[in-house]
Amino acid sequence: PPQIQVYTRHPPENGKPNILNCYVSQFHPPHIEIEILKNGKKIPEIEMSDLSFSKDWSFYILAHTEITPTESDTFACRVKHVSLNEPKTVIW
């Protein structure tokens, strides 16, 4: 099943714009759905890297979006894939 890592490009500081990355790897077949959530709601505009594959033919992809974290906001990455019984959510 897919491995999911959620991290920011720069050290997070409340009120400072940042990029939230959701790196998903070790999945096969290549079809996958990735959402970035803010307070449980899908962020509509996210960027996706090209789908790539590793030496072992598993796939990986990076989804990212600009965020401005605050104390009260929660961000997460939700992944839907055929190898998962239900969507997997990882909170940042």
Curated annotation (Swiss-Prot):
TM region(s), chain numbering: none
Keywords, in A-Z order: Disulfide bond, Immunity, Immunoglobulin domain, MHC I, Secreted
Annotated CDD domains: IgC1_beta2m
Domain Ig-like C1-type: residue ranges: 2-91
Organism domain of life: Eukaryota
GO cellular component: extracellular region; MHC class I protein complex
Gene3D superfamilies xrefs: Immunoglobulins (2.60.40.10)
Database matches in PROSITE patterns: IG_LIKE (PS50835), IG_MHC (PS00290)
PANTHER family on file: BETA-2-MICROGLOBULIN, MHC CLASS II-RELATED
Name assigned to this protein: Beta-2-microglobulin
